[in-house]
Amino acid sequence: MQISLKKYTLELKHTFSISRESHDFQDTLIAGLTLNGKTGYGEATSNPYYKITAESMIKEIEGIKNEIESFEFTTPESFHSFLEEKELSNFAICALDLAAHDLYGKLLGKPLYEIWGTNNDQYPTTNYTIGIAELDTMVAKMKEKPWPIYKIKLGTDNDVAIIRELRKHTTATFRIDANCAWSAEETIANAPQLKELGVEFLEQPLQADDWAGMEKVMHQCVLPVIADESCIVESDVEKCGLHFNGINIKLTKCGGLTPALRMIKKAKLMGLKVMVGCMTESSVGISAIAQLLPQLDYVDMDGAILLKRDIANGVRIGEDGSVVFPTLGGSGVTLNQ
């Protein structure tokens, strides 16, 4: 099996801001695995919050390149088990795991959702994310991209007022992501007003380790709350089940599709709502997420829509949020360059 690694710098259409950072460009690593004339692609973006760069991931993977290329590939699951034994970050494992799943599906000539025993005739609509900005800029972004569901990034001193103003310009469903910027008291106080303004749920309002605060929120908040920063890996699901109404799985954080599939199963057994979210990433990562759609309650896979230019082809998202799946097997990904 041959491996290729390449860093890309993705340019965004607009500056993207959340409660803790802003950026106009996003570095990402694209990994390729080639076997028997087929190449599978995977992606993992850099992430300053977790101190991950494209360069650090490349260095990690290059350290075991010979072992990867001599690995007897049979299934993505066995390959993931092999990777877990190495000293790799979950981000690096994710890039390789996504490539392995894409390769596996291409070798079989089947899309991943079919291999997993699901079909793609019903799936949740992705939200479109509006980052923190001046109010007129946020309104302009909504008008530029009419969409049935918006995720609104918050974490300012006037969050409820922002939603009240945005509501004047659309009838779309709102989802709120405060990225750990609120206290339990703020969350409980804001929720009734936000519910009246058409907010569906709140995503990670509190700091990731504020379990006592989340216990208060669980008992007193009138809106469902979805874990993001509190739910990183498989072992987090059980604790989140006692403090949240659902979880948002990020493939880069948990280590790819292989653990994500297990997390989905575990969360559903616990009665939790399941969402998969994206980074600002290309269609390589988005197409992998899309394979999970039939198993999800919610999805946030607008990352490639936020880019000035995508580096890959795969799943396409229509102007109404509909998804067009590629005819290729696996995730169906090809690179543009």
Swiss-Prot record:
EC number assigned by the record: 5.1.1.-
The UniProt record lists the keyword Lyase: no
Residues annotated for Mg(2+) binding in this entry: 177, 203, 228
The name this protein goes by in its record: L-Ala-D/L-amino acid epimerase
Known cofactor(s): Mg(2+)
Family: Belongs to the mandelate racemase/muconate lactonizing enzyme family.
Highest taxon of the lineage: Bacteria
Record's miscellaneous remark: Part of a large, functionally divergent protein family. Protein modeling and substrate docking were used to predict the substrate specificity, prior to biochemical analysis.
PANTHER family: D-GALACTONATE DEHYDRATASE-RELATED, ENOLASE SUPERFAMILY MEMBER DDB_G0284701
